[in-house]
Each structure stands twice: as structure tokens, then as C-alpha cells.
Amino acid sequence: MIKRGLVAVHRWLGVALALNVFVWFASGIGMMYWDFPSVSSSDRLARSPALDVAAIHVSLADAFDTVGFDSADEARVETLDGRPVYRLRNGRTARIVYADTREMRRAGSREQADRIAAQWSGQHIAAATVRGADEIDQWTVQLPVARLRPVWQYTWPDGEQVYVSQATGEVIQYTTRASRLGAYVGAIPHWLYVTPLRKHGPLWSRMVIALAASATLVAALGLTIGMWTFSPSRRYWHAGMPVRIPYRGWKRWHAILGLLLGVAAMTWAFSGMLSMDPFPLPGDPPQTGHIEETLRGTIQRDTFDALTPAAALASLGNAKVKQLDCVLVGAQPLYVATLESGDTRIISLTGVARSSFEVPQIAALVAAAVLPDEVAGATRLDAYDRYYLDRRRGRPLPVVLVRLGDRGASRFYIDPKTARLVGVYHARNWVTRWLYHGLHSLDFPWLYRYRPLWDVIVGGFMLGGTALCCTSLVLAWQVLARTLSRRLTPANQIRRDAREGRPLQ
């Protein structure tokens, strides 16, 4: 009785989920190589011109006065529409001040957005189709981008699309025909990023969690049923021969693939559910906030009076600087200049520049933020390790790993070129590290470092899962067709067929 009930639940849940799980597996192959289009800070820097030092006439203190800030969490100098600007943020309030005239930027004009988009794409603005957009579309559906609406959207005949935020003047999204195709093959179906659903964040989240939980259940039931029915002693017969599996046709293939891939299917569905934070998980270690505050302190109005940004840039001679960050590291005011080459220079208020922090300096900064005897060691890493990794190799290297001697064996990864915290691991993060990243992406240390071995193994599992789902789709269609046929067949016809010994269709 219990077995029949489990079979019924597996069958009908499978009918309901077959198409969705098929899409997840098939799009998982795309996700191995293509992500959802996005614009990172490094993308903006790569396309930004170098700062014109001679045009910077406004001090940081003057910029603070212009926007009415006494302090700021972030302050940097960069180029906007060919002019140097200060970008200041205090909490959730962000302001832009032109560093050549001390004028505060209001909402950007269409003409300015035209120049920004043309500079980004390298194409003539006259060839673009332009529209103002306040509504969320497929490429601005992610929350960080959606918050920067309204935008000007530019589309060129070759398929390039550039979205310029009217509020910040930044390019917040950029797509090409290839990147959009990659998203349609991978991220959009895999994440259920259908715009009418995704723009309602809470509803989308609940739906993904429910579908993933149901898929986990259906895979677990299928695996249980398969193990119940599997007979190592070949107690079933088919075509006059003893067999281990009591099914024929598509059911037989479904059972074989399910026994081979059922565990993988179940863990993929479960780990995918974990990506949505279905239940509260422990966060970062308590020392994280103290370390972040030490590495990026609050900037006061007069913090950089001893050396203005223009003077700091001049101290680098002819170096082409794209961005100048004003930071407070361990209560010491510093400038972090990002060069055209991508390298950085750290400039003190005495005008002395260096390329990075040394390992002992980073360790001392962390020790100042926590109990001094908590620091168990600090080392430089030139390659990713098991807790600091990036399959697409976008996270910075080298980094300084600072280990604490606390109960959670906390690990902090700090970029020595910027003194920025770029990674954290604590024993309480094991669920995210191993049950999500480990099971969902197979980001295991013995595998993810080795390409194309990782591609072969993960791709093989994805293809096998897709094949398993193909059998599910066929069986789902057969179940639905049989059920509908019975419902549409008159009752007297069913009784007549039964009396005459004809099988039901």
C-alpha cells in the first residue's frame, strides 16, 4: 500500500515537473559557459578614459560642502562624459560633483547619455535606436540594475545594446546578440528569469523554492522506488530471459537512468534550492564587520586636506589613472589609483606611492580589528584555494589569507593591491560552500582546478540528466494521454470493452 502510494506521488509529481526539470538540466549545460549579461566595475574601468589631472580644480572637502556631507562611506574620482567627477556615498545617499566646476550633477540629459553610450560602444549615436525606459525589461530585471532606473536604452544595428542610468550617468547594462543568446540558452531558463515573473521578486523566489523542493522529493521517491524494484538476482523475466528491472520500453530506460543518475538529480535539485536561501543560514563570522570597518573607515570632510586628489595624481607623474579611490585604511588616509594597465598604486598623504600592502601589514590591520591573539597566521595566495575560488577567474589574485584561531577557523581573504576584503569563510558557512557550491557546481578542490576534466564530468552528468528528463517527458505524455483517453471514453464503452476482453486505451 505504501509502495503504491509512493509510486502514485512520484508519477503525478513527475508529470507536473517533467518539463521544468528538463529545462533545468538542458540549460545547465549553457550555464557552464554563459552567464546573464552584466556590467561590472572592471568593465566600466576598461572602457573609461584616463583622468585629466589638469581639469581637477575642486578639493574633496569642497565636494563634501557642495552636497552637504560631513562624512562619506565612499569617495572616488573618475571620468563622466569626458569630465572628472567625485562620486560620493553616505549610507544609501549617493551624489556626483563635477571636479572641474564644483557643480552637483542633477538628472542627466539625453544629450549626455548619447555621448556616454557612443563612447562605450565606439559607434555613432545616429545609427542607434534610442528610447527612454522606466519599465523593467529582460535585461534590467536584476535588482541592483532595476534600482537605477529610469534608463536610456540604445540599440545598434549589429545588436549591441547599452543602458545608461539617468540618475548616475553610468552604463548599467550592456548586451550583444551573442550574450543575449547565451542568456536565453543558460541563465534565463535555468533561473526562471521570465520577466513578468522575475520582476515580482518574492513571488519568483517562492516559486523557485517550491519547484526545487518538489523536484528533490520526486527524485528521492524515484530513487527509492528504483532501489525497491531493482533485483540483483534477476527475479523478473522479459522476452524469456531473467532481468533485474521489471519494466519495458521507456519505463525501463527511465529506471536505468534513474538508478544511475538519481542521486545526482536529487542533490542538484536540493542544492539549487539552497541558492534561494529557503531557510535562514548562519552568516559571516562576527569579526567581519570590524575588519571591514578597519579596512574601509568613514571619511570625514577634512580627511584628505593634507594632499588633494589632484596632487596625489600629479605625484604619479605621467601614469594614466582611470580611477582614484579615497580610502581610510586602519585610520590612515590613502589614495588607491587604478592605472590604465589595471595595476594599482597606493599613495599616502606624503605623496609616497607603492604597489601593494605587504603581508605583515595586512595581518596587523586584521589584528587591530579583532583580538590580537586571534590571528593564527597570514600568507600570500597566488592561486585559488578550496574556500576562495572562481571558476571564471574573475576574483582578484594574489590575495592575503589571514586565518583566525577562533572556534570557526575563520578565514579572511584581502586584496593586497587595494586592502579590500574580497572573501570570507567560517565553519558556519559549510552549507553554502559544500552543499550549494560543491553539489550544484561540483566546485570540489580536486576537480574545479582541472579543465577540461571538470567540463567532461559536469557535461556528462548534465547530458545524462537531460536524457533522464527526456524519458520523463515521454512517460508524462503517455500518462496524460491515457488518463485523458479514459475520461473522454463513455462509461458504457469502457464496460463493453471490459466484458469483451479488449484492453483499455
Regions found by a protein language model. Give the residues of each.
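Conserved histidines in hydrophobic membrane contexts and catalytic metal-binding motifs
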Residues: M1-Q505
